[in-house]
Amino acid sequence: MDRRDAMGLSGSGSYYIHRGLSGSGPPTFHGSPQQQQGLRHLPNQNSPFGSGSTGFGSPSLHGDPSLATAAGGAGALPHHIGVNMIAPPPPPSETPMKRKRGRPRKYGQDGSVSLALSSSSVSTITPNNSNKRGRGRPPGSGKKQRMASVGELMPSSSGMSFTPHVIAVSIGEDIASKVIAFSQQGPRAICVLSASGAVSTATLIQPSASPGAIKYEGRFEILALSTSYIVATDGSFRNRTGNLSVSLASPDGRVIGGAIGGPLIAASPVQVIVGSFIWAAPKIKSKKREEEASEVVQETDDHHVLDNNNNTISPVPQQQPNQNLIWSTGSRQMDMRHAHADIDLMRG
């Protein structure tokens, strides 16, 4: 018996395992047929494939080359665990969700806010919600524009039917009288924008500390001329409220000015630029008149009810309420007719 037979009988490993580089083929045995017949399969109790699994796997099962090399080199490991190492199955790959077309939803199906929205989209949505425009026409965008003045709102502004005018004053005419006469031609408020020319006589009102007026004679250049005549609250366009002021420069360089309290005689042809606009003060007054008339009618009705309850005959005829209304309106019209046709400039 030679050495190779002794190794086969003693049960030691008498075969080689030649593995290729690919590692896909089954192991190859070298030895006599008797030695190959002396090999027997040992059941592997710990094998996950049951007791029928053998030490050598099928060609479809590939072992670990590192374990096979270690087993062949050491010769101490059993042959049934040398090369039958099965790789674990790969983890189930998640099927990628197909992206839907269109804009992503803002809210999920359960009502929660979707996290797919970026921070930029959220930042752009928030200001739009805070600056959301209300319903209806925005204030101040109608036909009747309103302009804020000191402490109140004017019913109409200069942008409503504003019209410029040029007043030409000849030499020797009163500039103040020309402007006042122009303001009384219609129910429009006026304002003096600018003036150019020279005056020979100017009467200016002194401050309240020294009441009175001072008359200046000579040649003075007009630096500025300003005024605004607003329709009075009684509705008469001939009764205006306002004051005319002027600034003059003397030939020696002095500047004088103040409210005009007398004639302002032109020394050269003077041009005055005036702007006229509609101010709806009479409309407010008409509303007040309607309220007063309704109050008078209410009082007369109350008196009639009291007289009927006392079973007394009222000496006042039935047409008296209408007569009172007509008489009050007529009296006011008479007052309007006898209103001053000119503005007293001495009142300031």
UniProtKB/Swiss-Prot annotation:
PPC domain: residues covered: 157-299
Entry's Gene Ontology cellular component terms: nucleus
Intracellular or extracellular location(s): Nucleus
InterPro entries per record: AHL, AT_hook_DNA-bd_motif, PPC_dom
PROSITE patterns assigned: PPC
Comp. bias (Low complexity): 47-60, 112-131
Signal peptide residue numbers: none
DNA-binding segment(s): 98-110, 132-144
UniProt feature, compositional bias: Polar residues: 31-46
Keywords recorded for this protein, A-Z: DNA-binding, Nucleus, Repeat, Transcription, Transcription regulation
UniProt short sequence motif Bipartite nuclear localization signal, positions renumbered to this chain: 98-106
S-S pairs: none
Chain segments carrying region Disordered: 18-156
GO MF annotation terms: minor groove of adenine-thymine-rich DNA binding
Highest taxon in the source lineage: Eukaryota
Free-text function comment from the UniProt entry: Transcription factor that specifically binds AT-rich DNA sequences related to the nuclear matrix attachment regions (MARs).
The record's note on its domains: The PPC domain mediates interactions between AHL proteins.
Name by which UniProt lists this protein: AT-hook motif nuclear-localized protein 9
Organism this protein belongs to: Arabidopsis thaliana (Mouse-ear cress)
